[in-house]
Amino acid sequence: MFPNVTGLLNKGHKIRGTVVLMRKNVLDFNTIVSIGGGNVHGVIDSGINIIGSTLDGLTAFLGRSVSLQLISATKSDANGKGKVGKDTFLEGVLASLPTLGAGESAFNIHFEWDHEMGIPGAFYIKNYMQVEFFLKSLTLEDVPNHGTIRFVCNSWVYNSKLYKSPRIFFANKSYLPSETPSPLVKYREEELQTLRGDGTGERKLHERIYDYDVYNDLGNPDHGEHLARPILGGSSTHPYPRRGRTGRYPTRKDPNSEKPATETYVPRDENFGHLKSSDFLAYGIKSVSQCVVPAFESAFDLNFTPNEFDSFQDVRNLFEGGIKLPLDVISTLSPLPVVKEIFRTDGEQVLKFTPPHVIRVSKSAWMTDEEFAREMLAGVNPCMIRGLQEFPPKSNLDPAEYGDHTSKISVDVLNLDGCTIDEALASGRLFILDYHDTFIPFLRRINETSAKAYATRTILFLKENGTLKPVAIELSLPHPDGDKSGFVSKVILPADEGVESTIWLLAKAYVVVNDSCYHQLMSHWLNTHAVIEPFVIATNRQLSVVHPINKLLAPHYRDTMMNINALARDSLINANGLIERSFLPSKYAVEMSSAVYKYWVFTDQALPNDLIKRNMAVKDSSSPYGLRLLIEDYPYAVDGLEIWTAIKTWVQDYVSLYYATDNDIKNDSELQHWWKEVVEKGHGDLKDKPWWPKLQTFDELVEVCTIIIWTASALHAAVNFGQYPYGGLILNRPTLSRRLLPEEGTAEYDEMVKSSQKAYLRTITPKFQTLIDLSVIEILSRHASDEVYLGQRENPHWTSDSKALQAFQKFGNKLAEIEAKLTNKNNDPSLYHRVGPVQLPYTLLHPSSKEGLTFRGIPNSISI
């Protein structure tokens, strides 16, 4: 609380302030490149275009263009609200400040203030210009009896006539609702109401309203029945997390579906509008959809390049020699810098991709069984392997609907290095990568398209030296007599010579196709992007910016998270979008993720709980973090537990500063409304599940916040930034399969005998879809130059609480220690899974990174 300052401030005192802002100096993506007839016009080299006609430099802010009014935190008016000071306008431009970042400008301002106004705790700002600007901060200096007061703003400010209520910002001090200075209470409540809106009307791009809706905008039925998609969310058939509401008009053919939009609404402060380079990465995805894919289609339509790879070297030529494209096709590629960097043409007709890490040392190590197994522990999808506790593996599919789906793998065929099946099970040495239940319900429909695939089960054995090896793969299909008749399957065993080795290589490819699709749609999109969005919405609607939990969680939401998800709905997961065009499930892709969401459990997103549930760890008080890993050399789990524990310790330290007892948590009205809304609205289709924490205790609050931070930072990093390093070689991570295993006596079988490479390439992702896939995942795998990583804050003055700042510094120091520790582990030759045959050290959970394609770094938020 502020001290009593009656009589301590002199009448007529002036408070000096500094306002830092950024001009709107970059055109929107749709202005940078206008799309017409598949071509791109208005190409600009830099991707940045200063709006000189709208803003005449910094002088536009002077005069009477922008005004501020201080609001007292200690003195109330007749209505019980903090007194409001006089309108004060920006003054001269400061030539330089040591703390200014790129593109930032600072202005002087002097406020008239006296003892009757008390101490400022908030301010109004009004923009009288026709163009918006990005307000970074206000700093008040030498406030009598108080010193410096800082306001961290980070918000777009539009012309004041566009707002129903004045724009208000609060000082960087945290208050629980019950501790808010009485003059600020109504301001706090009114700002939350503004952010909630009234749930009606179409949202305008300048608005800051957060609300919920179902995923009813993925299809485009007005353009054809083939583009209609089921609504996800709001039903037991297709449950889903909620997205941000836009209020767009319905389609003509389906009144429950929304029309696609040229530019999808997200609350304005969720989109930095290209002030951040991460936005250029994000809009690179849109560029791939609108510019790059049509360019590739043109090249293939002209038969300029065949749609098949004929050898593995053909695939590697994407990175080595490049592929030829017509000059007019090259010229239509997007002007965005990130796209130019990915598609290196050197002014010629040759298009090259960056060599992916997986083949930078060895061109063929990806083919080994050791690497195939290792990537289940240290690859881009390391959270799916499970410890096997019974044999044969059973199914959780409803037998009344699907019949018996117990695995048909026989014990007799497994090479367990002399162990019996009972010994292997009892000693925790059998593992499974099981996609059977996920794919079987959709496989009949998938295989009616041009795609052909299996539902796979892979059995693995932990050898005496601590490394993992595959011992059998089961390839399953729905029974030809109907779903209730069960399934048919082939069991493929390891082989290293003859046609059997080709069949084994193909079997591994079918497994990876399952894994690639599950990874992109479930491990990545659903389990990080989609499930976090309701938390973002609820936090902005129910937790004031001065609430300590808002300050804790905000950096793990900000930058571009909701904007990224909106772009995904627009270009990636939409009907005929990039995912449908290049991944096996095609039109059933997101529907499959809804089927998986039915079994999503919030508390299982805690890494220790996840490892225990997957039988990859057991509780053991004598082991680090109270868990003993069944595979000691499990890089994702080992590194992840270090990061998880550091996050949890930081959350405990921080939360303890504001909540002395469990009753403080129970009585926090904003916190309780927040959690109620997360459960009942944001994840409303699962609201009746018994596993939701009640949020009544300190431990529950710590666990909830730790899960949110872990999911938005480390988990997303683990499943995102390895996509191109591993998947940039389509041979290693194919995204679809086009034919089943050739049967003996067929022409395809004879081809397989003659050329294993051609048989493999005719089965997996063809060239056109490969180019789409690589274009997308190279962007997704990059870090922006202004990325903010775990243990960092964009503004060092994010809070005025010195104890919170000390705890955060402790967290940052711990992460630096962890990074050094993980580096040492990667240098230990006994930890084989950390590097593997491809000689790619596991660094995805190293907290820090440089810009670009680095295979490391944990950003604070889902920023790509």
Swiss-Prot record:
Listed Gene3D superfamilies: 3.10.450.60, Lipoxygenase-1, Domain 2 (4.10.375.10), Lipoxygenase-1, Domain 3 (4.10.372.10), Lipoxygenase-1, Domain 5 (1.20.245.10), PLAT/LH2 domain (2.60.60.20)
Q: Which cofactor does it need?
A: Fe cation
Q: What is the protein's given name?
A: Seed linoleate 9S-lipoxygenase-2
Q: Where does Fe cation bind?
A: H524, H529, H716, N720, I864
Q: Which family does it belong to?
A: Belongs to the lipoxygenase family.
Q: What is its EC number?
A: 1.13.11.58
Q: What does this protein do?
A: Plant lipoxygenase may be involved in a number of diverse aspects of plant physiology including growth and development, pest resistance, and senescence or responses to wounding. It catalyzes the hydroperoxidation of lipids containing a cis,cis-1,4-pentadiene structure.
Query: What is the gene name?
Result: LOX1.2
Q: Where is the composition biased (Basic and acidic residues)?
A: 251-264
Q: Which organism is it from?
A: Pisum sativum (Garden pea)
Compartment list: Cytoplasm
